Amino acid sequence: MKVAILESIVMPAGHEVEFDRILIEGLKTQGYDPLFFVPEKFPFKFDYKTEVEYLAGGEVVSYAGAGKLEKIWRSFLREKRRIAWFNDAYKKAVQGKCDVIIVPTATYRYLRTLGNSYLKESPVPVIFVFHGINPDEKQKFIKFAKKCEAYPNIKLKIITLRDDFKADKLTNVDLIDPPVFRPWDLNKIKPVEKHQPLKLGFFGQYRREKNLGFFLDAFIQARFTVPVKLIVQGATAKPEDSAAFEKYMKEYSDYEEIEFWHRNLIGKEWHEALLSVDAIIMPYAAERYRYHWSAMLFTAIGFNKPLLQSPEINPEVLQKFVIGEALDMTSKGAFVRQLEHFVNKFSKNIPIYNEALGKANVLYSQENLIKNIMD
């Protein structure tokens, strides 16, 4: 069975790249024949070693560097091209070039586009994968999801740990668990162990909402009983985020125990960076993290890394598995004490972390993701 991944998102950080890799490799493992449907001149960040079909309609439209008026124009152009891509995907399905189409990172806007394209009448199943629905977008999602009920081959899958749609009785929506992100070389996955210095990692796409200054101040105030090294990596998409990250690099340049990496980490370099630390810190403060599954959290699980995270990040996981702690963000003093406790008790808690991470990896396996999408 040929399964087409209709991808049109280009991002600087690694999780979109990694999610597509999970799909491609997972589909192959379970006996499917995956391929990509992508816009013309699509800039792949990774060689997935799989077939590629290009979609007519123009190249991907980026908002990078666009002012207010320019962004409005690009938004219009993006929608126009998305309709064209969907129409061409429909043609390819009619021609028998695939048996299933998966749109791996959808929003309600994709369903609006679908309604204006031929793809809604697809002769093969078209599976839209959503990575969470914010409350302020829920009604828009429901509106377009209900319209899709008229088209039996349109399937909607929401990756979530919540159940916010029980009362809405949508017949075409399934809620599925998130997958862990794992190293390419599974032999490199090690149990949690004691190392000196204990390395803490702050990774991912940096946005100013991620409380980095609050965390750095707490880190330099904390008194640890073991040597500690902090790695702070930031991939930045917007100029204002890049400037903020550079500012932190200058402010904390005198602290030898803090190492900054202002660059994207893709593929092997990303995996090696994650494997090099003992624990992952996620002091991200934004309410939307309750509704969208955290790729960084599920990377930590897949790489067997205990974590310290803000309470907004998928709290359902820590309620099930003792793989770390939810941070007390009420004051810097409370944060400092918790950071000290986490680091100073880390060695003692290693057996607990290993058992919980093992169970979490089973529940949130990549194999389960593929089964849930294709079911």
What does each model-found stretch correspond to?
Residues T29-R78, Y108, A235-D241:
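N-terminal strand-loop element at the rim of the active site
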Residues M282-F298, S310-E312, E316-V317:
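Nucleotide-sugar-dependent
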Residues P191-K210, L216-R223, L230-I231:
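Conserved donor-binding/catalytic core segment of Leloir-type glycosyltransferases
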Residues E7-R21, F44, R207-K210:
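A short, glycine/small-residue-rich beta-strand->loop->alpha-helix junction that serves as a flexible
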Residues M1-G14, T105-A106, G201-F202, I281:
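Nucleotide-activated donor-dependent transferases that construct or modify glycoconjugates
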Residues K229-F245, R263:
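Glycosyltransferase donor-sugar binding loop
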Residues G14-H15, M329-D375:
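A charged, aromatic-enriched C-terminal amphipathic alpha-helix characteristic of glycosyltransferases
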Residues A243-H271:
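Nucleotide-activated donor-binding/catalytic signature segment of Leloir-type glycosyltransferases, i.e.
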